[in-house]
Amino acid sequence: MSRIGKQPIAIPSGVDVSVANSVLKFKKGNNTKELDTKGHVDVKVENGHIVFSPKGDDRQSRAYWGTYRALANNIVTGLTSGFTRQLEINGVGYKAAAKGKILELTLGFSHLINYELPSGVEASVDKNIITIKGDDKQVVGQVAAQVRGFRPPEPYKGKGVKYVEERIIRKAGKTSKK
C-alpha cells in the first residue's frame, strides 16, 4: 500500500482544481497547470482535498498511485510558493550575471557561456550565489543541473559550480619526491 498515495492533498485558498477525463487542471490567477493521469488512478476533489486511489489492484496501478499524488502535490506547491535551487560558484575569475532571460557565465573557458532560461524560470545572482526560481520543480532542477554541468566541482581544489547544500569530498594532491 502506498503511504504517499493515500495522503490527501489540501487545496490552498486561491488555487482552483478541476478533474475531467482523468486530467487534473490547476489554476491560480492566470497561471494554469495540467496533470494527465492517463487513467491509471482515480482522482476525486472532495471538501477541499484531492484524493487519489489506484484503478486496479495490480503492481503498476499502485506504483502510479504515489507517483501521480507526488506530481500533483508538486504542482500545488509550485503554484503557491514556488521552488528554488541555489548554486555556488568557486574559482578564481569565475563569475555569473543574470541579464533578463540569459544567464551569463564566465567559468574559465576561452568563451562566455550564455545560458537561455526557459519560460517560467528566473535567475538572480548575488556575488557567487546563483538562485534559480520557478513554479515547476522538474524544470527548476533541470536548469540547476545544466548550469552545474558546465563546470562541475573538482575534488582537488573544489573549483566549479556546485549546489549550496552539496558537500565536495576532497582528495589529497600528489606528494612530491625529496
Curated annotation (Swiss-Prot):
Alphabetized Pfam families for the sequence: Ribosomal_L6
InterPro entries: Ribosomal_uL6-like, Ribosomal_uL6-like_a/b-dom_sf, Ribosomal_uL6_a/b-dom, Ribosomal_uL6_bac-type, Ribosomal_uL6_CS
One GO CC term on file: cytosolic large ribosomal subunit
Keyword line: Ribonucleoprotein, Ribosomal protein, RNA-binding, rRNA-binding
Any one of the GO BP annotations: cytoplasmic translation
Keyword Heme part of the UniProt annotation: no
Protein family per UniProt: Belongs to the universal ribosomal protein uL6 family.
Protein name listed in UniProt: Large ribosomal subunit protein uL6
